UniProtKB/Swiss-Prot annotation:
Expressed in liver, expression levels decrease in regenerating liver. In bone marrow, expressed in large progenitor-like cells, cells with ring-shaped nuclei and, at lower, levels in hematopietic stem cell-like cells with round nuclei (at protein level). Its main location: cytoplasm. GO terms for biological process: apoptotic process; cellular response to heat; endothelial cell activation involved in immune response; negative regulation of apoptotic process; negative regulation of Notch signaling pathway; positive regulation of non-canonical NF-kappaB signal transduction; positive regulation of protein kinase A signaling; regulation of cell cycle G1/S phase transition. This is Transcriptional and immune response regulator. InterPro entries: Avpi1/C8orf4_dom, Tcim. Disruption phenotype: Mice have increased number of myeloid and lymphoid cells on peripheral blood compared to wild type controls. Red blood cells are small-sized but increased in number. In bone marrow, cells show higher colony forming units. Seems to be involved in the regulation of cell growth an differentiation, may play different and opposite roles depending on the tissue or cell type. May enhance the WNT-CTNNB1 pathway by relieving antagonistic activity of CBY1. Enhances the proliferation of follicular dendritic cells. Plays a role in the mitogen-activated MAPK2/3 signaling pathway, positively regulates G1-to-S-phase transition of the cell cycle. In endothelial cells, enhances key inflammatory mediators and inflammatory response through the modulation of NF-kappaB transcriptional regulatory activity. GO terms for cellular component: cytoplasm; cytosol; nuclear speck; nucleolus; nucleus; plasma membrane. The keyword Nucleus applies. The gene is Tcim. One of its GO terms (molecular function) is Notch binding. Keywords: Apoptosis, Cytoplasm, Nucleus. Monomer. Interacts with NOTCH2 (via ANK repeats), the interaction inhibits the nuclear translocation of NOTCH2 N2ICD. Interacts (C-terminus) with CBY1 (C-terminus), TCIM competes with CTNNB1 for the interaction with CBY1. It is found in: Cytoplasm; Nucleus; Nucleus, Nucleolus; Nucleus speckle.
Length: 106
């Protein structure tokens, strides 16, 4: 008994195709927005705080202040934001450990 040849390659779903050039379409890169060095360039501090708050950030005000600090260079801002993230992570781990121990005690 012989197996029937598979025609899977010819009946491939169009959702699996990655390149639009298969059908002769091209990406229109000329209409794209130009990249900027500082993504917070044209935004005020209140709007940034609101953006962080709406995304669920509990330290929105502190994070926005770090970004808008004029006397810090980019490297200092990065370190400050990473430290803020680490403090939040450490507090979460501390909370989870306390919760774990309180369950064992009761």
């Amino acid at each position: 008994m012989k197996a029937k040849p598979s025609h899977q390659a010819t009946s491939m779903s169009s959702s699996l195709r990655v390149s639009p050039s298969i059908h002769g379409y091209h990406f229109d890169t000329a209409a794209r927005k130009k990249a900027v060095g500082n993504i917070f360039e044209n935004i005020d501090q209140e709007s940034l705080q609101r953006l962080f708050r709406n995304s669920g950030d509990k330290k929105a005000e502190e994070r926005a202040k770090i970004i808008f600090a004029i006397d810090q260079d980019l490297e200092e801002k990065t370190r400050a934001l990473m430290a803020l993230k680490k403090r939040t992570k450490d507090k979460l781990l501390q909370f989870l450990k306390l919760r774990k121990y309180s369950i064992k005690v009761h």
